[in-house]
Curated annotation (Swiss-Prot):
Compartments (UniProt record): Cell inner membrane
GO MF annotations, alphabetized: proton-transporting ATP synthase activity, rotational mechanism
Record keywords, A-Z: ATP synthesis, Cell inner membrane, Cell membrane, CF(1), Hydrogen ion transport, Ion transport, Membrane, Transport
Organism the protein comes from: Acinetobacter baumannii (strain ATCC 17978 / DSM 105126 / CIP 53.77 / LMG 1025 / NCDC KC755 / 5377)
Function as written in the Swiss-Prot or TrEMBL entry: F(1)F(0) ATP synthase produces ATP from ADP in the presence of a proton or sodium gradient. F-type ATPases consist of two structural domains, F(1) containing the extramembraneous catalytic core and F(0) containing the membrane proton channel, linked together by a central stalk and a peripheral stalk. During catalysis, ATP synthesis in the catalytic domain of F(1) is coupled via a rotary mechanism of the central stalk subunits to proton translocation. This protein is part of the stalk that links CF(0) to CF(1). It either transmits conformational changes from CF(0) to CF(1) or is implicated in proton conduction.
Assembly mode: F-type ATPases have 2 components, F(1) - the catalytic core - and F(0) - the membrane proton channel. F(1) has five subunits: alpha(3), beta(3), gamma(1), delta(1), epsilon(1). F(0) has three main subunits: a(1), b(2) and c(10-14). The alpha and beta chains form an alternating ring which encloses part of the gamma chain. F(1) is attached to F(0) by a central stalk formed by the gamma and epsilon chains, while a peripheral stalk is formed by the delta and b chains.
Annotated SUPFAM superfamilies: N-terminal domain of the delta subunit of the F1F0-ATP synthase (SSF47928)
GO cellular component annotations of the record: plasma membrane; proton-transporting ATP synthase complex
Top-rank taxon: Bacteria
Main localisation: membrane
Family classification: Belongs to the ATPase delta chain family.
InterPro entries: ATP_synth_OSCP/delta_N_sf, ATPase_OSCP/d_CS, ATPase_OSCP/dsu
Protein name: ATP synthase subunit delta
Keyword Translocase found: no
Length: 178
């Protein structure tokens, strides 16, 4: 996963830079979401990855998926990906693009994993602290993961704050076995 993200990041940055320059970040966002969903569809992906398909034919398939929403710039982007055998990266490119878009809008998407459901007050306290830490507006989504035992894991982009009992026990185990 990290390797795919590393490969996808330059493409996402280039797409975002171009879209920002053209004032078309939302159009590109929509196109990348549709393309990402298409690549994740098993039947479409199986057809797309047939060895006899040329990169140009692969791009034509995506043109059918996007229909009228496909601009020449998106077509050129798909051609670049197809020529470099990188169409499989579209979900990661779309995710990274959305992250860049959020950063540009001074917004950070945060996932809080908690061993127990958070109260509205706890969620608001965490949100306020995270907004102060990131100096941005924070959009919070909470996931309950009982396997953490206690505490929380906070994920914001590529940053992870792990204050879970599971993590602390794992560190203790490592020290004892060393």
């Amino acid at each position: 996963m990290a390797e795919l993200l590393t490969l996808a990041r330059p493409y996402a940055k280039a797409a975002f830079a171009y879209a920002s320059e053209q004032g078309a970040t939302d159009n590109w966002s929509n196109a990348l979401q549709v393309l990402s969903a298409a690549v994740q569809d098993e039947a479409f992906s199986a057809y797309l990855n047939r060895p006899e398909l040329t990169p140009a034919e692969q791009v034509k398939l995506f043109a059918k998926v996007l229909g009228e929403d496909q601009s020449q710039a998106v077509s050129n982007f798909l051609t670049l990906l197809a020529d470099n055998d990188r169409l499989v990266l579209l979900p990661e490119i779309a995710a990274e693009y959305e992250q860049l878009k959020s950063q540009n809008n001074n917004n950070v998407d945060v996932v809080i994993e908690s061993a127990f459901p958070l109260t509205a007050e706890q969620e608001q306290l965490l949100k306020s602290a995270l907004e102060k830490r990131f100096n941005s507006t924070v959009t919070v989504s909470v996931e309950v993961k009982p396997e953490l035992i206690a505490g929380v894991v906070i994920r914001a982009g590529d940053q992870v704050i792990d204050d879970s009992a599971l993590n602390k026990l794992e560190k203790m185990r490592t020290r004892l076995l060393a």
